[in-house]
Amino acid sequence: MKLYSIDFPLNESNNIFPNSSENININNNNINNSNPNNFINSNTDSELYGNYKPSSSNNFINNHHNNQSSDIHSISQSTPNLSTLISSSSNNNNNNNNNNSPNYSMNSSSDQAPNLLNMDSKLRWNQPFQNQQQQQPTSEVSTNSANTSSENTTCNNSPVSSSTNYIPNNSTSNVVLNSSIPTTSPNVLSAPNKKRQRDDIDCGNNNNINNNNINNNINNNNNNNNNNNNNNNNNNNNNNNGYIDPFYLRDDKDFNNNNNVQLDNTNISQFNDSKELNIKIKKDNNNNNINNINNINNNNNINNNINNNKNLQPQQIQQPQQPQQIQQIQQIQQIQQIQQTQPQQQQQQTQQQPQQQPQQLMSGNLKLPSIHHLEFEVEKNAKKDDSTNTNNNNNNNNNNNNNNNNNNNNIQQANVNTSPISTSTTPNNNNNNQIQNQPQQIPQQQAQQQAQQQAQQKKRKTKPSKYSITPSISLTPTTVTSSSSTNSSGSIGASPLSTSTNIPYSVTNNLSSNNLHSYMNPMGQDYSTSGMLSTTNPYTHHSPNTSSTVSSSVTSPLINQYGTNPTLTNNHSFYGSLASNQNTGASDGNNNNNNNNNNNNGGSGYFQSPVILSPFQKSSNPLNNNHNSNNVYNSSNSHNDINDYISLNSSSNNSYYNSNSGSGMTTPQSLGHSPSHNDYNSNNNNNNNNNNNSNNNNSNNSNSNNLTNKYDSNSSLSLLSSIGDNNNNNNNNNNNNNKSHSSSYYSSMSNNSNPSSSSSSSSSSSSSSSTLSSLNNNNKLSSNNGHIKYEPTSSSNYHDQMSQSHIYQNNFTYYDQSFPHPPVKKTHRRRPANIDKSTLYCHNCGTKNTPEWRRGPSGPATLCNACGLAYAKKQREEETNLHKLLLHSNSYSYHRGNMLESYVTPSLLPLFNTAANVPYLNTPNNASSSSSSSSSSSSSSSSSSSTSSYSSSSYNIPNTNTQYNTTSATSSFKPLTFSSLKTPENTRNTLNTNNNKINYSLNGSI
């Protein structure tokens, strides 16, 4: 029997193993929902591949066509040709002694797998297999070969940058703990799972753990094939529940070797003491790396023991202790389960899924958790730590009976033993311990969750279920006893918000168990093992369970644009982890930056969550992403100010997001997870070169003066308008170093629509502040701003005319002299006392002699006696006739008859001021004034708009627009606008015909 070490290519649709009768289901954690009751195939397709079901449960690994590292197909008889070694060691991992590079030894009895030697062409790795195709029966490879080829070859493609890419964490091992993975039946899985690669084999940091986990998974699969025969092995596989990164390098002290996962002395002591399950990280863990696990013959545990490394033997002596420990822990667990009522368990299940989802939402879901998560029940969680730790161990022991849970248990022990490899700067390697601390669900709860998740998956396979953030009892956070809060890069299930000691809200160990994971991670990549998880970053809001690579949903661009403002402890370690893990040298093929990662801020974790929650505080410091110092912040300052925005697009040279595979999927660029809009992705897809990364950094560096944070400068607008700018402009502009982070929104849109024009349009060096100033300073009537300009239809002094007194001057004062009205005061027919009768004459007949002078219409003593009597009689008759007429009319008119006596002022009469110079009557004066004013205003507006429109690019079509000078710095992509642009001739003509009309002409070339 030959032992073969296997390299897992990150190739799409490379089935390393053809179809073998029996699956070595490499992940019993199959980070999705595998049925804990499915003992035959504990590594169900749902576990490994999220919610996508492979073609067959036996060949679920065959379904990893696209993005998982190696499609290890069901290997009933492990293939002899698989000599490639899975070894990716971080640069810092020199502590691993002999078996640092895990030889994925396969007990091969058949040659069903293709030679891996021929698979280099399909590998996405920048480098072919280096020293790793050593066919060694001993499954041991020197540490140097592993270190040289590990991260460059295996992990060049970060899973985040594209569906096939993997995140090479150079920092500590990121262990994906699906500690209690409620696994669903493999039938639930959807066909897209075929394109998924095996669960996140996160390069670099997770190599030891993943290799250990793969070996454990293979062992578990063998056990699954031999459930009846492998009960002891299942009991031994306490640590198989977690998914360990197969690329994680392992020592010769691998306790997981042989299916029989043996605990270290530290692990045994800790594992025996349920209260001390907060496994303290010991600095000796670097030496306690996982040894390569030889493949187990399907029927013989003895063969497995024979095939295992010599290091396994001392550990095998410890095996009989585990069943007892398991029984004790199971008893404790049963007691706890009895205490927990069934409805509480259901609530826990419902809550665990929501909490699993927020971490899984990390890279691409619009449904973003509220900021409330940042400080969510920290005190309650701190109180729950001890109980949850005991629950975790109890769950691990109970899960030992379940082949599905064996991998998770292996992961925890692997986490205990394995130390973070690459984080030399992080004083305490909390990576593995946080993973251990992740609570594991009770098997009953797993079964319930499994049923729920299966029902949900049947209903909707791609849509995430709504999630609440309330922590479930079973998932109560466990305290990480590590003293430093430099969060371990391996803290996979660890709540991003958790301090080093507390996971603020229960970490969802079922990373891919929920539908959300399949929704957000259709490729099934589990990134929690990858460096994506903020390894030193307790603050990352989500564990990156869901790959942003294939997320169908769009992350909220605004929230992604901002750096988080971690309110908890260790801001330095938080940002240090962001900056240091920003560089994944394998993606760019640059190993030099791998050392810079840990050296910048002392942090080792990626800043994972696209959900970067912050109070949106603008940083006064421009973000200078230096090409050499991969620090996210100003490399010279390396300030870890919380208020600093993390430059979303400042693609540090090795940021795992930079290398794009052109998959058309939202690949968050660099640390800030650029908005996953398809508009922005088009440009990123075009830029698959590593040169773009360096050029982006160079452009950022050259713009250090201009590079006011793209959220800074005066552009409140640039926050919205520059959403896709840095990604598109920096990626597309290899030659444009003058591109400022905040280019206008439309230029970025044009860049997205046409990548060819993006480089040209982005060459404008105007910053967002200049853009806003130009926008504000443009002529108010010009069409540059894209606004429709309206002008008054009448003269500008219209309000003056309204306010003039001519409207009001006659009111109640003007009397028409032609209208008959009585004098202001009546005489009461009183004869004047002193009349000179010699001067009197009758106005009617002219006589001067009369016995009595009577009153007439002209006043007293104007008529002679006869004329006066006749006149009075006539007046009476007329009045009588008038009253008669009024009596026959309506009563209102009769009583209103007084108004005929003209006591009412004439101005109130109906048509009194008909001839007055009121504005609504176009008298010649008004017409002339209004026309002149309107003509002047329209002409001025036309001139200004015409000049401005010609000076600036009018409606740049992205395909044809190569105009570099946007002098007005308005948006190069200007919408259609109707403005009052008119030539003087048109103005004259329109004013002559219609004085009050203004013709709005269409401005802009189409």
UniProtKB/Swiss-Prot annotation:
Zinc finger (GATA-type): 842-867
Compositionally biased intervals (Low complexity): 55-70, 87-110, 128-158, 169-180, 205-241, 388-410, 427-456, 468-496, 540-557, 590-601, 619-638, 681-706, 713-785, 928-954
Matches recorded under SMART domains: ZnF_GATA
Keywords noted in UniProt: Metal-binding, Zinc, Zinc-finger
GO BP: positive regulation of gene expression; positive regulation of sorocarp stalk cell differentiation; regulation of transcription by RNA polymerase II; sorocarp development
UniProt GO cellular component terms: nucleus
Keyword Protein biosynthesis: no
PANTHER family with a match to the protein in the record: GATA TRANSCRIPTION FACTOR 22-RELATED (PTHR47255), GATA ZINC FINGER DOMAIN-CONTAINING PROTEIN 12 (PTHR47255:SF4)
Listed name of the protein: GATA zinc finger domain-containing protein 7
Protein's gene: gtaG
